[in-house]
Amino acid sequence: MNTIEISNELIQFIESSPSMFHSIKTIRTYLDEAGFTYLPESKAWDVKAGGKYYTIRNHSSLIAFKVGNDMDSYHFQMCASHSDSPTYKVKNVPELAGPNEYLRLDVEAYGGMIDNTWLDRPLTVAGRVLVRNGSKIESKLLYIDKDILIIPNVAIHFNREVNNGYKYNRQIDLCPMFSCGALKKGAFDKMVADELGVKAEDILGKDLFLVNRQKGLVWGLENEFVSSPKLDDLQCAFVSLKAFIEAENEKSVNVYCCFDNEEVGSNTKQGAMSTFLKDVLHRINAGLGKTEDEYYQAIAKTFLVSCDNAHALHPNHAEKTDAVNFVTMNGGIVIKESANQKYTTDAFSRALFTGVCQNVNVPVQSFANRSDVVGGSTLGNLSNTQVSVHAVDFGLAQLAMHSCFETAGVKDTEYAIVALKEFYETNVQIEEAESVCLEK
């Protein structure tokens, strides 16, 4: 498969994942087709050497694992990404009537997006809806496959400051227009009910989010770029999933994690700071008939690749990045490092993962923020509060992070799959952070 084919598959993966709930459904489809067995958290687990399994939490986070056949002295090799992206959530009472005959939606920010990128483009909604069905309450996925909303800008004639650093007020400026007389109040819930084939009065709860309807594409004179909504972080979710499914390792339990709520801090029951990963690893250990002490031995030898995209050198603002620790699109995978531990990378984990990449000739780039810029954190250092393991922060270089339409390099998607597959297939033997053997 060449870079264009991989990029087009990535675009399809993202288009089938308009919300975090749909992201997990898409990932489950890949796993089901690859022969994985679903293990509900609420049921007893039957875990065997050589088996392939996955479990989900809240239908928005997923952990999958492949058990090797030689589990005498085992450990975990893990990749973690996230299923969510910055957007706007529709409030429970969704409609704002007026002025005049306008009908608008009442929304609030989910995460730290670039607000103005959401204006003047066709939008829709996606997520989950909880519906009464007799004595049961059932969860249903919703995606309105139609252009139904726009957040209109104010004409420059009425807002002369729009090009002079105008600050958008999310309560006033960012309410999507739903109708101008054709629909009456109550139309939104009726639309949702009609789409699901239920009665509006049977809808008891909604987690619905705005979706950018713009299609992803490969572009450039030499087809060197891929642009799409949600590259952060579905590009990493995609590449780590492809590598995980393709790889085999007889002496490791390979683990794939895709957590929800990274964009709002991860401090939820299904986020990276939850007990989800710890719970799953303990249950794997128990299923293999191992003791508690053997579990802690395995954790001491475990390695995590925290997968979240990185900021590429900007063509118009090179001054925003460090003078030498900057990265470029199509330049290879990125290892991110931060002295204040916003990223998990240290010398040991950098050396280990660089060695893995060198084994398959994947170029490695180094990213650090400018010393006068406070960068964001991601999954690895947060999940380590629950499961403390050696970890590296990995990503792919992209532009316009947290825009509703982001840009990355086509080569890097392939680089990442190759590197992460090599990681999963390598028996990473860690000895107390003093040495590591990378054997296959």
Language model segments and positions:
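N-terminal hydrophobic/helix-forming segments and targeting peptides
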Residues: 1-440
